[in-house]
């Protein structure tokens, strides 16, 4: 699918970002950049077919989201730390995949759980302020697709409880994601 077709699919062609949303959108762009690189890092673990398959499927959606965020934000509004988000995303994908399929699924579930909450905050803000309903719809589409990834990872992992180490890892991902969002809103 060409970029313009994708932008049309998300109804994102004529949206201008309200000033009070630029920081959030910058963090969305940074986050989608990191997400693309999570899957690129995971793909390096080429001997695990399950990881390769999940990475291939999820990567395309994250790449689509990044195309949309690139379209919506001007170059001057994008994070100045994109190289950092690429390195961190790649490292997270590579390390978690290296530790095995279940651990990779725990990672994806944790990341996507954070992303869902992040998008929902923005959707709620736009709805309450009654501004930019077109942007709200784009964010809802992205959020719904992130929830699909979260549910896929949860299902693939199985519904048994996480180990203590997996819980610690999940909490670390949540804290790291929170720091990344706050930094990328500013820089």
Where are these regions (language model features)?
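Non-heme di-metal
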Residues: 1-187
């Amino acid at each position: 699918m060409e970029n313009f077709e994708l932008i049309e699919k998300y109804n994102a062609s004529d949206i201008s970002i309200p000033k009070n949303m630029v920081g959030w959108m910058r963090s969305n762009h940074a986050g989608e950049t990191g997400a693309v690189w999570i899957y690129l890092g995971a793909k390096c673990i080429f001997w695990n077919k399950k990881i390769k398959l999940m990475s291939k499927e999820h990567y395309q959606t994250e790449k689509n989201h990044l195309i949309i965020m690139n379209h919506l934000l001007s170059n001057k509004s994008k994070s100045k730390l994109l190289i950092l988000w690429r390195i961190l995303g790649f490292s997270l994908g590579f390390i978690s995949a290296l530790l095995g399929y279940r651990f990779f699924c725990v990672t994806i579930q944790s990341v996507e759980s954070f992303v869902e909450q992040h998008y929902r905050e923005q959707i709620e803000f736009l709805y309450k302020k009654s501004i930019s309903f077109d942007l709200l719809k784009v964010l809802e589409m992205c959020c719904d697709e992130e929830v699909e990834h979260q549910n896929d990872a949860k299902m693939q992992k199985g519904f048994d409880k996480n180990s203590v180490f997996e819980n610690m890892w999940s909490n670390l991902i949540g804290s790291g994601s929170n720091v990344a969002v706050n930094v990328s809103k500013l820089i």
